[in-house]
């Protein structure tokens, strides 16, 4: 072909920072001398191995950044003179660049030729690129490779081979003996090649990530070429370890600016959460246990409390002082309250208002213990229940030392009277148990003589027992501290499913045996049918008639 190559540029041994360039010249049929200048303006730096499995095409990363090769054509007797005449856009021909992959370091051939050593590195993607005529960054032709990938990790380099298809006969090579005739279809002629710098192909685990698109890639994409542009940084931490020096990323400053630019406060999460309900909590006030000792948690229900009413001398009741009988208010009918066993009974908080009942001396015998029955007169036939309202009870502060007579049971206070005027004593809170109805049949009238009238100051309300049971004599006795009612009888055994028992279907006759060898049950006298000598029938008026059967015809 009569091509001449400049040795200083064609060997490609340049500094890594400088782009590799290659220059080659040839003489056409018409005698023109053309100079081809091929230069890699954007070198590949890294790539991620995509493997060779069935899913290798689904998650494939291209070589980053995409290689870009520049081609310029000059015409002149020498290369220095030819640079003054650039004919890249005027030259009528088609060019394409074909990329191949090779190892950066030539592997020595070993004694054992393994298949992996003989297999060349596999390049996937689009290895062919046509020339694009662009104005920027220079008036030249550019070859772009935005879709090149490598299947195996290692250190490689790319080799770009330039092919030309001439359109005019004057621009073709001089005649050769073995050249095809002019009437043959067009062909591509190899012009030159150029190699890129070495780049590293990482595995999927060690791949540091794709970098931001270079200014050259953006410039080429702005002119209509199909190049992937990444405006965000996709760098991965090195070796999976943190670095206190702030160099976790290769471009830490760009990553920091990007993070600040894209950080947007989430206003949806700034809504105030609904406050937690404290209906059953003791954290209502900082001093809830001191200011409200009678407060009980809402999760446990306690039975109504009983109060011993002791009216004062200036009370509104008109019957005070008119009777010598004393009376204890009858207890209300029992009510069942469900309370979990894990809830302890409410503690009793002693206050200074109950001190007179606990420390004043008394000249009378102490009240009966909880297991003793409450004595009342025999002639009391009607009983009323003192209304209980724990919310309106008030502890009596001033206790009078005078003695008062209590009205008979028939003149007890009606439930409609107000309760805030009756002094009462806050009873002890007891664990909830189901109490049976109180039954009081008879009591000795002599018990009234043994217990004279006791003033409110000398009288202490006896604690109520936890559970009661009725004795044989009709009196009310205590069954113990935590005794419960007798358990209900066990339910009758249920037959599994809805099937009938065996005895309901078959006879349970001990004399019944298994019949074998054609044996049958012997007929009894009762089982034999009576002779058909007579028959009965009922007439229309309801009478029964008997008639002798005529069996003589047989």
Curated annotation (Swiss-Prot):
InterPro entries: Velvet, Velvet_dom, Velvet_dom_sf. Residues 166-175, 500-528 have a biased composition (Basic and acidic residues). Keywords: Cytoplasm, Nucleus, Sporulation, Transcription, Transcription regulation. Residues 31-230 form the Velvet domain. Residues 363-372, 485-494 have a biased composition (Pro residues). A motif (Nuclear localization signal) lies at residues 45-50. It comes from the Eukaryota. Disruption phenotype: Results in increased conidiation associated with stunted aerial hyphae. GO terms for cellular component: cytoplasm; nucleus. Its main location: nucleus. It is found in: Nucleus; Cytoplasm. Belongs to the velvet family. VeA subfamily. PANTHER family: DEVELOPMENTAL AND SECONDARY METABOLISM REGULATOR VEA, SPORE DEVELOPMENT REGULATOR VOSA. Component of the velvet transcription factor complex that controls sexual/asexual developmental ratio in response to light, promoting sexual development in the darkness while stimulating asexual sporulation under illumination. The velvet complex hat acts as a global regulator for secondary metabolite gene expression. This is Developmental and secondary metabolism regulator ve-1. It comes from Neurospora crassa (strain ATCC 24698 / 74-OR23-1A / CBS 708.71 / DSM 1257 / FGSC 987). The lineage of its organism: Eukaryota, Fungi, Dikarya, Ascomycota, Pezizomycotina.
